[in-house]
Structures are given as C-alpha cells and as structure tokens.
C-alpha cells in the first residue's frame, strides 16, 4: 500500500485595512494573554490575535461582539493585558473620557496599542471629529495618566503608538498630572518620548519603533501566515 503524502499545512491569510504595523509589532515584541479590541468591526484583528492564542474580548456599537454599545458607557467586568484601539479615537466626541476609560481598563503594566489616521485638519471626513499627530496623541495620553516617555511611535499612512501603562507623575511632587491643560509643557516634557516645547513641532514620524521587518512568534495553528494590507508593504 502506498502511503499518502503528508498534508500540506494551510496558509492562513489576514488582510488589514488599518493597524498593520502596530499589530505586527505587538505580536512580535510583547508578552500578553488577554486583549480588549475596541471597535472590532468585522473582527480581522481579533482573528489574528486568536491565531496566536490570545483571549480576545470585542467591543462594537452593534453586531456580534462581547460588549455591544458605546465603549464610554459600557460596564467592564475585568481588566486586560492589552487594549487594541485601531481607528477609533478619531470618532470620539469626548476624547478625555475615552482615554481615561482605556487607562482604567488596562491592568498595571498593560499595553495600549492605538492607531489613528493621518490627514490634514483642512480635510473634513465623515465621522472623523479630530485629527492626530504624535505630539497631540502623547499630550492627551499623558493627561489621561499615561507616562509616554518610553512609547513607541511610527507615522506612515497612519499613526501607530504602543505604550505601557505606567502612571504619569510630576516627579518633583510625585503626584498625578492635574486634569485639563493646566500644567506647562516644559514640566510635562519628561513624560514625552521626544523633546517638546511650547510652541513646538508636534509632527514626529518615528520614535523607538525599530525595524519594520517583523518576526512573528509560533502560532497556535500550523501553516504559513500571510499578512497583507492595502496601505503597507511588509517584508
């Protein structure tokens, strides 16, 4: 009897419209188990996380999600190792409330991975209430409690940011940052991952990101992994 040839492992294909660099870096470089996927949409990011054995909890305004509704109004029953937030912040009417809730949803030392579109403020787009760059996103995160001094940033066709949850403190008083924009930038400067001053340039294209040739860890399923994006070419 002739032995059957071994089965060829499947090719697992993933297509990301947004967030490709952030999700690849997150899977490659960070150790975590649970993920809160805010604005999960069709679930492609969640599918990728699960392919690597992550436990994913999805949030969406409608559809088949673990938490259905406005994230700002949901009662979460746990904290998470990672909050994944891809192209959601630009839709928020209350950015401070949104980031405060993300901070509370993360475990101590948890990871926020956030992406947002980069388009000029002169351009008006359906549903996009804010326009972002590295300086503004870090400024808002610091006021929400995040120490961004070791954040990783990459601006391509979109802004990618990964930051660990470390509470932002004014070290000379060892106290949290006051709410609102009452603290001068020169005192907040140590909490940014790049030099800042007022007025200053907020367009920073890359900090602490490194090479864009991502080496993925072993997945939970055998076979080749193929990742494509309409906006980015991956090595």
Language model: regions and residue ranges:
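Conserved N-terminal segment of class I S-adenosyl-L-methionine
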Residues: 1-84, 98-99, 103, 130, ...
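A short helix->loop->beta-strand "cap" motif at the edges of active sites that frequently abuts
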Residues: 53-54, 108-110
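Short catalytic micro-motifs in class I SAM-dependent methyltransferases
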Residues: 86-91
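Helix-to-beta-strand junctions that scaffold the AdoMet/dcAdoMet cofactor pocket
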Residues: 92-93, 106-108
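Conserved beta-strand signature within the Rossmann-like core of class I S-adenosyl-L-methionine
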Residues: 109-117
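Short "lid" loop at the C-terminus of a central beta-strand within the Rossmann-like core
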Residues: 117-122, 153-155
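Acceptor-substrate binding/catalytic loop of class I
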Residues: 121-140, 144
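Conserved S-adenosyl-L-methionine
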Residues: 146-158
């Amino acid at each position: 009897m002739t032995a059957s040839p071994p089965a060829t492992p499947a090719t697992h294909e993933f297509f990301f419209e947004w967030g490709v660099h952030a999700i690849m870096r997150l899977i490659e470089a960070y150790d975590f188990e649970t993920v809160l996927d805010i604005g999960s949409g069709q679930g492609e990011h969640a599918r990728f996380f699960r392919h690597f054995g992550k436990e994913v909890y999805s949030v969406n305004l409608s559809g088949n999600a673990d938490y259905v509704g406005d994230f700002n109004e949901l009662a979460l029953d746990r904290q998470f190792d990672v909050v994944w937030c891809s192209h959601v912040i630009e839709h928020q009417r209350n950015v401070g409330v949104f980031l405060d809730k993300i901070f509370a949803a993360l475990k101590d030392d948890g990871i926020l991975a956030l992406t947002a579109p980069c388009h000029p403020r002169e351009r008006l787009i359906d549903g996009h209430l804010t326009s972002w760059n590295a300086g503004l996103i870090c400024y808002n995160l610091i006021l929400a409690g995040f120490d961004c001094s070791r954040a990783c940033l990459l601006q391509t066709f979109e802004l990618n940011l990964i930051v660990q949850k470390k509470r932002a403190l004014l070290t000379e008083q060892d106290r949290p940052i006051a709410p609102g924009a009452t603290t001068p930038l020169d005192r907040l400067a140590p909490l940014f991952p790049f030099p800042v001053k007022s007025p200053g340039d907020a367009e920073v294209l890359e900090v602490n990101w490194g090479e864009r040739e991502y080496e993925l860890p072993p997945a939970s399923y055998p076979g080749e992994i193929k990742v494509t994006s309409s906006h980015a070419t991956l090595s």
